[in-house]
Structures are given as C-alpha cells and as structure tokens.
Amino acid sequence: MAPQSNRKDLHLDAVLHHDMNMKSKTAGFESVEFEHCALPECDFNAVDLSSEFLGHSLALPFLISSMTGGAKDAEIINCRLAEAASEMGIAMGVGSQRVSLEDSLHSGLGKTIRDLAKGVPLYSNLGAAQLMDKQRFDNAQRAVDFIQADALFVHLNPMQEAFQQNGDHDWIGVLKSIEQLKQRVDVPMIIKEVGFGISGVVAKQLVEAGVDAIDVAGAGGTSWSAVEGYCQTDNKMQRAAELFRDWGIPTAKCLEQIRGQYPDLPLIASGGVYNGLEAAKAVHLGANLVGQAGAVLKAATISTESIVEHFEQMALELRLACFGTGSANLRALTQARRL
C-alpha cells in the first residue's frame, strides 16, 4: 500500500477520534450579527434556498468538502457522501486523488461514486504540489476522468506539507503550473486551501492566473497543523505543530477580503462552518456555496441517512436565518441588515 494511503488512514483516525480543532481561533462569524426583522414579509416555508455554482443548479448552497481521498477503508464513507449529496441536491468534492492515481485498489474512490452522485456536481481533487510532477497535466485529466468530475479542485496546503514527514517543501513555480494547467484541463478549476485560508493578495494572483473559482477554506475548524503533529514521530515537529495549531486566516476575513475585490468571482466558504446560522453569515459575506468536511465526517461513518439528517438540520437553520432577516432568498440574504 502506498505511504500516502497509510498517512490518510492516520488523518482519518485523528479527526474522528481526537480533538484536532483550533484551540482559540474561530472562523470569525461571531463578528457578524444580523438585525432581527419583525416584519419579514415572506413565507417561511417558501424561502428559496436554491443556488447556482459554475453552471449547475443546486437545491441548497452546500458542498461536501474534500476529505478521505486516500484511506483504504474510506470507500464506504465516500459512497455514503455521494448518496447523500444526490438526495439533498448539493455538491460534493472528493479528497485528494494522489493515492487513486498511484494505487486505485486502496484509493477510497471507486468509479461508482459518479453513479451515486446522481444529478449533482462532483469535483475532482489534486494537490498543488503535485503540479510540479512531469506528468502533472496528464494526472490532472486522469483525476477528472476517473470520477467523471464536473470541475477540478487544486488544493494549496504548503503549511500542512511543511509539517508532514516527507512532505512537499519546494513550492517554487506552483503558481505558474496552476496557470498552465488551467489552459489544459477541460473542466472548470477551483483553487482551495485546507484550513489556513486564502488572502485577498493570493486571490488576486489566482484570478490573474485564470482560475474559475476559489474555496477560501479558512481557519477556525480543523487544524491541519495539529493533524500532522499527531502523525509526526519527530519531537521537534510535534512541538512546532502545536505552536502553529491556530495558524491561518479566519474564514470570515477571507470572504471579506476576496469578495470586496471580486464581486462576481464564484466563492466557496469552508473552514469552521458548523451550523446553518454560520452558513447564513457566510452567504451574507459573499459565499456562493458553503462547504463542510469534518462536521460531516462523523455522520458519514454512521450512515447515508445520518448525513442527510445533518444537512436537513443545516437547511432548517439557514431557512430560519433568512426568515428572521426578512430574506426570501439567498440573494436577499446578502443584503440583510446587521447590527
């Protein structure tokens, strides 16, 4: 089995069975407080929560964010996630496909995932560091073709790699490779972080490189410094990982920086979004979709029904936030008054 697959198993164990969240840093949504509207002038049951992203219509503005792409026992989790995404009418991004390209038997990603995610967008996923490989363009297209993806996530995770044993430490030329890949791949390309956030400055570089969308994947949820520290055997790196446990830009700050510069850029908010009220705040700050990974993972270990129940609760809370602000739809929510 590939070493990357072993590491993914450790990641899964860390997130499921240990506290890997940031200690004191939040996603920043507590700074957004809606003004209550006592005359909403809309029907609670008719509030429209539908959304559109990269040409696909969704029943709800939710994304099952990338996770469990390489663990050998993860296929059942991914199948449940795909089934739930189809039932709820939401998008799904798979975890890193680096392992599936090297060892398809232990990838956690069967080709049936496309059949299970019926009628909803499915997003492929590769690490930006792998774009430095000689076969990078072929690998990217293979990743897309392997699951018949509707778009390709490329994840930026330099700090995570820095804490990994045998991680990819040379990031010179990554931006140029992103620009070149955009010209070669035949689906939209979304750039995401993994929980440290994308700043307005980096977003500008990515937009100029031609990317189609950005997932800010900000700080406030799972700390990948902590996760990699858990996987480390080197004492110095373990201590450093704990020191950097709260490193990153809060998700709300990322949204404010990027949406202020690019009013029309498709944006995903993920990182420390735990409930429908926080999802409403993310939409208010400019997110077109709201992604969750760790918050969904425990439900995914139980059943498809548990995942569906999770997103039904999220949808109820989002609907309540819309109604409480007098917002008949998500577009109106972006203009809701704040205290």
Curated annotation (Swiss-Prot):
Binding residues annotated for FMN, in chain numbering: S65, S66, M67, T68, S96, N125, K192, T222, A293, G294
Enzyme superclass (EC): isomerase
Binding site for substrate: R7, K8, S96, Q97, R98, Q160
Pfam families (alphabetical): FMN_dh (PF01070)
InterPro entries named in the record: Aldolase_TIM, FMN-dep_DH, IPdP_isomerase
Family classification: Belongs to the IPP isomerase type 2 family.
NCBIfam families noted in UniProt: IPP_isom_2
The protein's name in its UniProt record: Isopentenyl-diphosphate delta-isomerase
